């Protein structure tokens, strides 16, 4: 009997009727923090019971409408039985008298389907929607964005714009949460109250829009109504708190510029606490939202604010333990020793959350000394002096390694052991440099790649090559190879000048307004165009992004017509130094070829007869590969020969770089744009855009002017991939692939017999033909030879034969 009782109860639950109250969706808990008391997620769980009884309407993403069931009816289970069939059961003995339900035994012995049928016959009271179908129609039309019906109902006086059911949710609430901008405009124009509190959370329409990150709705409410961002809902959250909950960085930036500037009309205190004394920075740290954290810190958010659990934002950041988030908070001045109400500091919390290793890396990368109780490290060398030492160190390591290879003179052997020793000296010297010097002024991960060491390697190579040319080659070959030596001298002058010029010149920093009002005006322009997203606004530098620009982590600035970040010149390559960089690369490559040619001429002129019997161990095999001239240099001019071979190796990747850069220039592309071509064939990226579907841009404005993101792309590069990137081989391979596909692809589409060219199938708005692209790169202004030697003063350069300013280039038309 007990088993039967359980079965009957589980199979015939009481129907559950949805209420009419509704509110926006709560933010999701992002981390299980059961062992931490009074977490931010606990505030959301306080309303969990209320959420279960919400309206069947569900909030949707900006691309999906939100609808609600306005007519409630009893819900039946899948075992529902028509009441007419109650009199005709499988067996007449099974007929049920309703009076027998009073008996427990009768209930237990009754068939499940029969109990369901009896339950379904109960009459439910009419809902508010059923009692007032006109208002229900109005609410449903606001949800669906049916402006015609809403206008008809309001103009006819059948409903008032602020009419609600008992939940006090207005039509404006529904229009806001469903991103119906046209409807919001109409309702506000007809007197809708933007501060009406409704739903279980007693939230305003602005709250609903902020919770879902709807920038365009928030902007209209803020600028065209008296919507109050300081109003609090039942959970004590204001508009800024809810914007942070949405994790839409564009909305957070908008509210910071609109409400947290010194001269904001609708002022919001950036560290305004909620009911648990948690600020917006607490919530952003809990969510590990690095973009929001950086934005809040930029506007002066206090990292020392304490909530009711004595948690500072740093403590909440350990819930996920992202290194970038922890690092940003420590660099902003967070107290790593501050203790919460459980008497735990950041080290204890890191241990509890199993991220102690990450925490130690963060402290090291923020300049903390592990040998001194993590106190701030006191560098014994300044950053400027450290960079100079780093740059000059290869000037000593390279000749030392070359001399090791020359040990033994003309009787030398043991080629492989000497090569290993030379590489060990070079690698060991760089390792010590990294530990002793670079670590004193660069605390980030991958210190070597962020230091001027590679620029030093190149300049040291050029320095010793020039010395060899001056003291060995030039005196011997000056007469017989006069023109080659003159060309060599000219090329040395060109690549030396262009190298240092490309290193120290401003690559094209897009000016960043110092006045927040200017930035806000740029944001307003983007909103008007429907382009306020991460493709058109830089969330790192807070400036409107010109086309072809990108944020540089090296200089921490937005670079106009960004090409790439080059460790060999220790600078970014942009609109102002790209021509200089190409001049450097071309002249360097030609200089290497001329140096190799003159070296062979030198060996040929000074070589003497040598007896093969005097060859050292392994030299017979080496000479059989090198030939007479090279073998003479190998046996008699060891340092020169080693420099020759080192330059030959450098020539490989420099040639790759020349090929890739030339190809890209002829196609009207930068390195960054070329790398992004294959991504255009993939699905669209999320760029935090919340443009309403009914948004109407200004006259003549196109919404398709997009560009690759500024890079918040993330790669997990291994050491091999990093090496490929440094040498430019990855770009060469990509160029080779696309070139071969263009030449030999016979892909056919359907019944069309035309060949498919991957280079022409993608839309490249900067490609105006090979000749025009080449002229645009080298010439500024009119197509005259003298203009080839002009460098951009600001961001000017040619595009399709016309001068454009890449600092303010927002459209190709």
From Swiss-Prot:
UniProt topological domain (Lumenal) ranges: 409-412, 474-485, 601-642
UniProt topological domain (Cytoplasmic) ranges: 1-387, 434-452, 507-579, 664-813
The organism sits in which domain of life? Eukaryota
- Entry keyword Transmembrane helix: yes
Q: How does it sit in the membrane?
A: Multi-pass membrane protein
An annotated GO cellular component? Golgi membrane
Catalytic center residues? 566 (s-palmitoyl cysteine intermediate)
Spans of biased composition, class Polar residues? 28-46
Alphabetized InterPro entries for the sequence: Ankyrin_rpt, Ankyrin_rpt-contain_sf, Palmitoyltrfase_DHHC
* Class of this enzyme: transferase
Which keywords does this chain's UniProt record carry?
Acyltransferase, ANK repeat, Endosome, Golgi apparatus, Lipoprotein, Membrane, Palmitate, Repeat, Transferase, Transmembrane, Transmembrane helix
Tell me what reaction this enzyme catalyses: L-cysteinyl-[protein] + hexadecanoyl-CoA = S-hexadecanoyl-L-cysteinyl-[protein] + CoA
**In which compartments does the protein localize?**
Early endosome membrane; Golgi apparatus membrane
Q: Which residues cross the membrane?
A: 388-408, 413-433, 453-473, 486-506, 580-600, 643-663
Q: Where are the ANK repeats?
A: 133-162, 167-196, 201-231, 235-264, 276-305, 309-338
- Establish whether keyword Cell membrane is in the entry: no
- What remark about domains does the record contain? The DHHC domain is required for palmitoyltransferase activity.
Q: To which protein family does this belong?
A: Belongs to the DHHC palmitoyltransferase family. AKR/ZDHHC17 subfamily.
Q: What is this protein called?
A: Palmitoyltransferase AKR1
Lineage at the top is: Eukaryota, Fungi, Dikarya, Ascomycota, Saccharomycotina
């Amino acid at each position: 009997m007990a088993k039967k009782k359980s079965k009957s109860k589980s199979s015939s639950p009481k129907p559950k009727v949805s209420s009419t109250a509704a509110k926006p969706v709560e933010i999701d808990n992002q981390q299980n923090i059961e062992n931490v008391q009074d977490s931010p997620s606990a505030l959301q769980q306080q309303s969990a019971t209320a959420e279960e009884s919400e309206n069947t309407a569900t909030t949707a993403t900006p691309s999906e409408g939100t609808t609600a069931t306005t007519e409630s009816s009893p819900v039946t289970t899948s075992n529902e039985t028509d009441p007419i069939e109650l009199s005709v059961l499988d067996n007449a003995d099974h007929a049920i008298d309703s009076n027998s339900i009073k008996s427990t035994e009768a209930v237990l012995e009754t068939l499940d389907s029969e109990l369901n049928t009896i339950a379904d016959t109960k009459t439910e009271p009419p809902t508010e929607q059923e009692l007032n179908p006109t208002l229900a129609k109005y609410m449903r039309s606001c949800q669906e964005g049916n402006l015609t019906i809403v206008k008809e109902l309001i103009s006819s006086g059948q409903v008032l714009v602020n009419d609600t059911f008992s939940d006090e949710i207005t039509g404006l609430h529904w229009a806001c949460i469903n991103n119906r901008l046209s409807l919001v405009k109409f309702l506000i124009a007809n007197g809708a109250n933007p501060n009406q509190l409704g739903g279980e959370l007693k939230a305003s329409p602005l709250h609903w829009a902020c919770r879902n990150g709807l920038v365009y709705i928030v902007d209209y409410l803020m600028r065209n109504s008296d919507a109050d961002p300081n109003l609090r809902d039942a959970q004590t959250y204001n508009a800024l708190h809810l914007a942070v909950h949405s994790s839409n960085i564009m909305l957070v930036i908008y509210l910071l510029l609109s409400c947290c500037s010194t001269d904001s009309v609708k002022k919001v205190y950036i560290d305004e606490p909620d009911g648990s004394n948690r600020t917006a920075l607490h919530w952003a740290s809990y969510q590990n939202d690095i973009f929001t954290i950086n934005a809040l810190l930029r506007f002066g958010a206090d990292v020392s604010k304490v909530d009711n659990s004595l948690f500072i934002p740093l403590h909440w950041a350990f819930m996920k333990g992202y290194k970038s988030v922890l690092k940003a908070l420590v660099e902003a001045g967070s107290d790593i020793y501050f203790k919460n109400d459980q008497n735990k500091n950041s080290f204890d919390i890191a241990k509890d959350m199993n991220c102690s290793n990450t925490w130690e890396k963060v402290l090291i990368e923020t300049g903390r000394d592990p040998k001194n109780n993590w106190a701030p490290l006191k560098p014994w060398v300044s950053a400027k002096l450290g960079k100079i030492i780093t740059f000059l160190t290869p000037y000593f390591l390279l000749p030392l390694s070359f001399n090791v290879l020359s040990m033994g003179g003309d009787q030398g052997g043991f080629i492989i052991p000497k090569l290993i020793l030379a590489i060990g000296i070079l690698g060991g010297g760089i390792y010590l440099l990294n530990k002793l010097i670079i670590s004193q002024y660069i605390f980030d991960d991958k210190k070597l790649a962020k230091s001027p060491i590679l620029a030093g390697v190149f300049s040291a190579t050029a320095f010793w090559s020039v010395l060899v040319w001056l003291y060995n080659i030039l005196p011997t070959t000056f007469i017989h190879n006069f023109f080659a030596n003159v060309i060599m001298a000219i090329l040395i002058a060109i690549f030396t000048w262009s190298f240092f010029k490309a290193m120290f010149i401003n690559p094209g920093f897009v000016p960043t307004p110092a006045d927040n009002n200017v930035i806000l005006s740029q944001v307003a322009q983007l909103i008007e165009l429907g382009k306020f997203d991460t493709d058109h606004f830089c969330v790192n530098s807070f400036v409107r992004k010109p086309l072809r620009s990108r944020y540089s982590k090296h200089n921490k600035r937005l670079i106009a017509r960004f090409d790439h970040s080059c460790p060999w010149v220790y600078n970014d390559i942009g609109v102002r130094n790209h021509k200089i960089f190409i001049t450097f690369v071309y002249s360097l490559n030609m200089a290497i070829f001329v140096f190799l040619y003159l070296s062979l001429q030198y060996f040929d002129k000074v070589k003497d007869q040598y007896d093969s019997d005097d060859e050292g161990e392994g030299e017979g095999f080496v000479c059989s590969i090198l030939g007479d001239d090279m073998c003479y240099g190998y046996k008699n001019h060891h340092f020169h020969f080693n420099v020759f071979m080192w330059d030959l190796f450098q020539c490989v990747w420099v040639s790759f770089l020349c090929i890739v850069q030339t190809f890209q220039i002829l196609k009207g592309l930068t390195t960054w744009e070329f790398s992004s071509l294959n991504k255009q064939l993939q699905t669209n990226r999320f760029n935090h855009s919340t443009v309403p579907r009914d948004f109407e841009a200004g006259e003549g404005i196109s919404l398709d002017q997009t560009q690759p993101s500024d890079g918040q792309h993330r790669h997990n590069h291994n050491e091999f991939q990093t090496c490929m990137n440094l040498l430019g081989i990855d770009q060469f391979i990509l160029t080779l692939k696309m070139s071969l596909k263009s030449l030999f692809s016979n892909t056919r589409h359907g019944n069309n017999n035309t060949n498919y060219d991957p280079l022409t199938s993608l839309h490249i708005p900067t490609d105006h033909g090979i000749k025009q692209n080449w002229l645009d790169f080298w010439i500024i202004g009119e197509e005259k030879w003298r203009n080839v030697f002009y460098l951009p003063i600001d961001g000017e350069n040619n595009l399709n034969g016309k001068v454009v300013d890449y600092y303010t280039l927002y459209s190709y038309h």
